[in-house]
Amino acid sequence: MAPKAEKKPASKAPAAKKTTASTDASKKRTKTRKETYSSYIYKVLKQTHPDTGISQKSMSILNSFVNDIFERIASEASKLAAYNKKSTISAREIQTAVRLILPGELAKHAVSEGTRAVTKYSSSTQA
C-alpha cells in the first residue's frame, strides 16, 4: 500500500470587508407576516367560556380548520358565480355555498348568523 499523504490544515482567507452602509440596509430581511384567526378565536372563547384557556396546538388546529372551511366556501362560491356567468361573488353565492358545504342544522344556523351579520354591517354603514 502507498503511504498516506500528510494533510495540512486549510488556511482561511480573510473575510471581505463591506465598504458602504447601503448594502447593509438593502440586505436586511423583513419578517414575513402570517395572518391567523387566533385573536378572533380567543375572543369567541372568552365570550363563551371566560375562565377557560387554549393551548397553542389547539389554536393551531382551530386556525387550520377555519382556513379549510374558508377555502371550501370560497371555491364553491366561485364555481357558483362562474355557472351564472358573473364575475363577482355576492352574499347570495356565499349563502348557497354554505348550504351546499355544511350539513343540515349547521347550515341553517350558519345562514341565519351570516344574514344577521350582513344586516348589522349594512345598517352601520348607512347610518
Swiss-Prot record:
The modification N6-acetyllysine is found at K7, K8, K12. Monoubiquitinated by the UBC2-BRE1 complex to form H2BK123ub1. H2BK123ub1 gives a specific tag for epigenetic transcriptional activation and is also prerequisite for H3K4me and H3K79me formation. H2BK123ub1 also modulates the formation of double-strand breaks during meiosis and is a prerequisite for DNA-damage checkpoint activation. The keyword Cytoplasm does not apply. Signal peptide: none annotated. Residues 11-24 have a biased composition (Low complexity). InterPro entries: Histone-fold, Histone_H2A/H2B/H3, Histone_H2B, HISTONE_H2B_site. The modification Phosphoserine is found at S11. Residues 1-35 are annotated as: Disordered. Keywords: Acetylation, Chromosome, DNA-binding, Isopeptide bond, Nucleosome core, Nucleus, Phosphoprotein, Ubl conjugation. Core component of nucleosome. Nucleosomes wrap and compact DNA into chromatin, limiting DNA accessibility to the cellular machineries which require DNA as a template. Histones thereby play a central role in transcription regulation, DNA repair, DNA replication and chromosomal stability. DNA accessibility is regulated via a complex set of post-translational modifications of histones, also called histone code, and nucleosome remodeling. This is Histone H2B.2.
